[in-house]
């Protein structure tokens, strides 16, 4: 109810401004005696995946809490895991506003945020300052806009080094459509070299901290079956711990079919569901259960969530579903598994 009231009050705001204000207001309420309006308590399902113990199957996808400003809030409202970021080595402003567009008639969102964030150091400080967080914390990392694609590996390795001790898992974002050439890192020598270097860094940090932090790769939905096979082979070859499927789509057919006023950027939400589920199904076939899949992209109902699990996902994440349906979707999804 409180989500609906605040959402209505802010209905005339720019979508990004509305989102930010909504989160700030909810964070404030969560620190008052009225926090019972926000907090959710669910029985722990104790799902084991990647050597981690998740209290439930549902996670928050990267993008909603880029800087770790709302960790306690998202933990208290029930998420089993929270993926922070995408964060980059250096702070950056991202693309010019407006850059976030909602299409409620199809439950779709187009964004061209461009990895706006306050940098990895700021995120780590925010994590250090949090207390009594009962959700698994993931950190999603990307490269800075001004880092050449040939040098992108260095950004990822430095960020892994900084994030390792403070995260339960790390995800590597090489699939956002809003950073030039980023998706090239999913293929060929750039991909294999990145994975090799990541595993070497992970092994080194494991010895230093005596702590194994799983590393996952987040992939694009705009890939064909041949590319899925190539990506899967590489993930298996380098013993990558997990894969997140998928990021947003730039498939013009899907976008034009759903959003007549076509904005530049990546499309998420319900229009992405069918394609992301297709990717998960094919990935699952190729990975043969050796690498877990986190299903993300278009989950706006129990039905779409169960489709992801049936296709082969071990865990699921939402973003657009939360934007359109508020806290009630968290309850529905968690109670359904």
From Swiss-Prot:
Belongs to the dihydroorotate dehydrogenase family. Type 2 subfamily. It comes from the Bacteria. Its cofactor is FMN. Catalyzes the conversion of dihydroorotate to orotate with quinone as electron acceptor. The gene is pyrD. PROSITE patterns: DHODEHASE_2 (PS00912). This is Dihydroorotate dehydrogenase (quinone). Transmembrane segments: none annotated. Monomer. Substrate binds at residues 66, 111-115, 173, 178, 247-248. Its EC number is 1.3.5.2. It is a peripheral membrane protein.
């Amino acid at each position: 109810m409180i989500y609906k009231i605040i959402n209505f009050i802010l209905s005339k705001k720019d979508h990004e401004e509305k989102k930010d204000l909504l989160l700030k207001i909810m964070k404030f309420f969560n620190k008052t005696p009225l926090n019972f309006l926000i907090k959710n308590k669910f029985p722990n399902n104790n799902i084991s995946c990647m050597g981690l113990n998740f209290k439930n199957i549902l996670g928050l996808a990267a993008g909603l809490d880029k800087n770790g400003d709302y960790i306690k809030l998202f933990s208290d409202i029930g998420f089993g895991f929270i993926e922070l970021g995408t964060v980059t080595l250096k702070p950056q402003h991202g693309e010019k506003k407006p850059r976030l567009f909602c299409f409620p008639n199809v439950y779709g969102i187009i964004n061209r945020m461009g990895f706006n964030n306050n940098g990895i150091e700021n995120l780590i400080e925010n994590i250090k300052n949090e207390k009594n967080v009962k959700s698994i914390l993931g950190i999603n990392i990307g490269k800075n806009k001004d880092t050449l694609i040939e040098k992108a590996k260095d950004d990822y390795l430095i960020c892994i080094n900084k994030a390792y001790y403070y995260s339960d898992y790390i995800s590597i974002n090489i699939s956002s459509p809003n950073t030039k050439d980023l998706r090239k890192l999913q293929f060929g020598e750039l991909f294999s070299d990145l994975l090799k270097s990541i595993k070497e860094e992970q092994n080194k940090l494991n010895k230093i901290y005596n702590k194994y932090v799983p590393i996952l790769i987040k992939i694009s939905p705009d890939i064909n079956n041949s590319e899925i096979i190539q990506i899967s082979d590489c993930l298996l070859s380098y013993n990558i711990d997990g894969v997140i499927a998928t990021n947003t789509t730039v498939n013009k057919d899907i976008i034009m079919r759903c959003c007549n006023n076509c904005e530049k950027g990546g499309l998420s939400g319900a229009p992405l569901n069918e394609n992301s589920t297709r990717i998960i199904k094919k990935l699952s076939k190729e990975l043969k259960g050796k690498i877990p899949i986190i299903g993300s992209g278009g989950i706006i109902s129990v039905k779409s969530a169960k489709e992801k699990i049936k296709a082969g996902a071990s865990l699921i994440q939402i973003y657009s579903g939360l934007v359109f349906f508020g806290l009630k979707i968290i309850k529905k999804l968690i109670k359904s598994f």
